[in-house]
Amino acid sequence: MAQGFAVGFDPLGLGDLSSGSLSSLSSRGHLGSDSGSTATRYLLRKQQRLPNVPPRGIRASSPMGRVILINSPIEANSDESDIIHSVRVEKSPAGRLGFSVRGGSEHGLGIFVSKVEEGSSAERAGLCVGDKITEVNGLSLESTTMGSAVKVLTGSSRLHMMVRRMGRVPGIKFSKEKTTWVDVVNRRLVVEKCSSTPSDTSSEDGIRRIVHLYTTSDDFCLGFNIRGGKEFGLGIYVSKVDHGGLAEENGIKVGDQVLAANGVRFDDISHSQAVEVLKGQTHIMLTIKETGRYPAYKEMVSEYCWLDRLSNGVLQQLSPASESSSSVFSCASSAPYSSDSLPSDRMDICLGPEEPGSRGPGWGRADTAMQTEPDAGGRVETWCSVRPTVILRDTTIRSDGPQPGRCLDSAISESPKTALLLALSRPRPPITRSQSYLTLWEEKKQRKKEKSGSTGEKGALQRSKTLMNLFFKGGRQGRLARDGRREAWTPDSGSLAKTCPRLDMEKAGGMGPVQKFVTWRLRRDRERGRALLSARSGSPSSQLPNVDEQVQAWESRRPLIQDLAQRLLTDDEVLAVTRHCSRYVHEGGIEDLVRPLLAILDRPEKLLLLRDIRSVVAPTDLGRFDSMVMPVELEAFEALKSRAVRPPALRPARQDTPPKRHLITPVPDSRGGFYLLPVNGFPEEEDDEELRERLGALKVSPSASAPRHPHKGIPPLQDVPVDAFTPLRSACTPPPQLPHVARRPPRPNWLLTEPLSREHPPQSQIRGRAQSRSRSRSRSRSRSRSSRGQGKSPGRRSPSPVPIPAPSMANGRYHKPQKARPPLPRPLDGEAAKMGAKQGSSENGTGGTAEEAAMKTPSGELKTVTLSKMKQSLGISISGGIESKVQPMVKIEKIFPGGAAFLSGALQAGFELVAVDGESLEQVTHQRAVDTIRRAYRNKAREPMELVVRVPGPSPRPSPSDSSALTDGGLPAAHQPLDAAPVPAHWLPEPPTNPQTPPTDARLL
């Protein structure tokens, strides 16, 4: 039974989705994006589906930016394809899972288990070779790349997997290459039927001759372009000849093959070497053979098949029937590979991430249909993957060296070669009847009638030409002659009048714009009336426009319309516009054409396409078409005109789209002020470097049984052991993180602070509030300036801590107004009394310095603690810093469960941090301590992390319980990913009772 498998591309993802949920496992899982779509035509053949088996659709996203749609009943054929098994696999004490995977959406496949180690935890859990992993820890792997799947599988020590027992593993087999040639004689594209070399397929009886070309050193131009080379598996062919050039004068034609030049054979020479031989020579002797064709592009078809698993776990091909003949028709092509270098045996596909340099700009889209007829006894499922089109470049032989040809996706007006290829690939218009409505006998009879009417029947009733006489100039005889050549139509004549198309051509020579417009309006009204009356009379000749003419006009205008549509619309919209226009040309119905077009062309730029679509509308439908389209076109014209004329400075402030909003947060500095920075405004170059290192670690050594392929275009399938990433990750890359839908902005913690002034008169408070409302004052850096002239200078601030001045640009520092956050409750009365007592003592100068000296004196023993960096987060929050007068040292405020600090058990809340990985944390600011600890924990190359802490002694020390209570109770810190930006803090005003600053705390990950 023949089974069909179709492979295509769905640019907007409108194809059938799989039954599983489509999950995006990593926002950075792709290695690149599509650099340009090639204009390939779609040749999709109908596939024969199995009876009573619905096809399964898989939409997969490729790292090259493609989207592959595979309609294949491969999984439904299996007896156990619908059985879902739940498998729980835990890592061994050595950190191994014990199985390898293969596949990935970049190959249009799912994630399959290809190897299971004996005695591993995966084997004990019941995982088998050939199982398809559909879900891991609640995340679907139906449409997932191999890189994202490996991150999910290695990101947790316990995996709860849902597998489908398929019993087979996908493999790959390479088939032959095919070259598409441009037949110069017949002006069409020819696809070779076999994978033989061009020298075998070319005509051996071609005329060979020797041509001598003489040039000068001043004016070196041979006047022809060459195409081909050894890297493409082709010879050197002439693809273009300059008109009137040296090559054309000596008889060189397009399609000739260059066999040798100055004694150098071109049978086995690269393109660049051929250019070097030809250029720079004043006398060139060429050996030319007339072949009448030159290569357009190449294609290489790779066929996927399935490997069956045996009892010992060794993979074997299901059936040799996959070697059966297959007919593949496609206009896609591959990267330049030689057919001799392709391996004929089967090899695995490397599923690791590719290097960015292995992708070229020629990747595009292609559609392929494949029909395979295996043996009746075997059961084989294959699908075909066709490489994207790569147009072979042309090189002009000039003194300045080769110039690469243009790609297929360039405009027709910019590339004559591309226009020629497209023109040759289009089918020829069908041979139709002449455009004349009259036969030869009828035409002679009509001439006699016109002659007799113009000479002998002067008094016959003629149609009034009063309106026409107002516009047309000339003598009366000319008008009568034109009137005599025109037949009047009456309803009782029973047939339509024959209008001569030569009449309009004769009038066009002596008409102005107004006359042409009136003529067009009269002809349109007359044809509309004829259509209405003929529809009423039921005449079979009611179809005024000839269908063959309209179809022919549509076929001639179709390439230009599609070219403009591809510049303005998406691929699906281009197909929809083409489908509606083709349906109108063959079936009619102007309303059915205009309504969907107006729905698709929903922007002023897109409405420019209506100008070209108007050319395929029948004359009888032009009035209705204009009445429906003209208002929309006028609005679009006004919109485009306003965009082009109005300068950017004069555009209104309010636009259709709302302005972008940026979340800002204050970041403290060492002088008591703060900066306003965006929440997500931190650079991500470090994260990109970490991602590249992580992707580079996914490379594995090639399989011993699989032969090495010298090219990087189609990666061979390889087994990816998931355990190979654990040591690499611990050595050089951060641990993989679970994918998330969208990164939430980090929740900032509270930074409790107080101003440093010692006097707080009521007048200054009132004056400070007025300053905050007017937003014209900024915070001063010096306490001495704040005590004098508080309202005289705009650069000085009030010592009142309650109001916070409005944002200003003084010294490049921003300040947040008081309305940004509601005030927190005041401290307890007892604490306020203590703080007041301290304030009084400090003001009197009795005891303030002693207390500060006691607090600054370090007490306690030093202790070195080592922490493992294998966990995703450190899990501590710290408080204090040099900017705090209460707690200038950095202390551990809280330890969060699940972090590295919690699992070690050696750290406790209240420990003072002295150094981390040899870098001191004494006499540093709070933000400097946060950055130092983050940087040390992210450096996975240094394992483990060494922390020097000071265990508090028996002497009483002030505890930052207030800040801890406010931080932990009022605003709990959120769990953040590893590569999140440093958590900033906000200023929070406190009552003016404590002249000192409480410690700050921040969450460290």
From Swiss-Prot:
Compositional bias (Pro residues) at which positions? 989-998
Q: Where is the composition biased (Basic residues)?
A: 770-786
* Keywords, sorted A to Z: Cell projection, Cilium, Nucleus, Repeat
User: Which SUPFAM superfamilies has this protein been placed in?
Assistant: PDZ domain-like
Where in the cell? Cell projection, Cilium; Nucleus; Cell projection, Stereocilium
Q: What is its main location?
A: other
- Gene3D superfamilies registered for this protein in UniProt: 1.20.1160.20, 2.30.42.10
Q: Where is the PDZ domain?
A: 86-168, 210-293
Q: Name one Pfam family in it.
A: PDZ
Gene Ontology CC annotations of this record: cilium; nucleus; plasma membrane; stereocilia ankle link; stereocilia ankle link complex; stereocilium; stereocilium tip
> Which intervals of the chain are annotated as region Disordered?
353-378, 700-859, 949-1005
Task: List compositional bias (Low complexity) regions by residue number.
Answer: 787-799
At the top level of its lineage, which domain of life is listed? Eukaryota
CDD domains xref list = HN_PDZD7_like, PDZ1_PDZD7-like, PDZ2_PDZD7-like, PDZ3_PDZD7-like
**A GO BP annotation:** auditory receptor cell stereocilium organization
Function statement: In cochlear developing hair cells, essential in organizing the USH2 complex at stereocilia ankle links. Blocks inhibition of adenylate cyclase activity mediated by ADGRV1.
PANTHER family under this entry? PDZ DOMAIN CONTAINING WHIRLIN AND HARMONIN-RELATED, PDZ DOMAIN-CONTAINING PROTEIN 7
Q: How does it assemble?
A: Homodimerizes (via PDZ2 domain). Component of USH2 complex, composed of ADGRV1, PDZD7, USH2A and WHRN. Interacts (via PDZ domains) with WHRN; the interaction is direct. Interacts with USH1G. Interacts with ADGRV1 (via the cytoplasmic region). Interacts with USH2A (via the cytoplasmic region). Interacts with MYO7A (via MyTH4-FERM domains).
- Protein name, per record: PDZ domain-containing protein 7
**From which source organism is this entry?**
Pongo abelii (Sumatran orangutan)
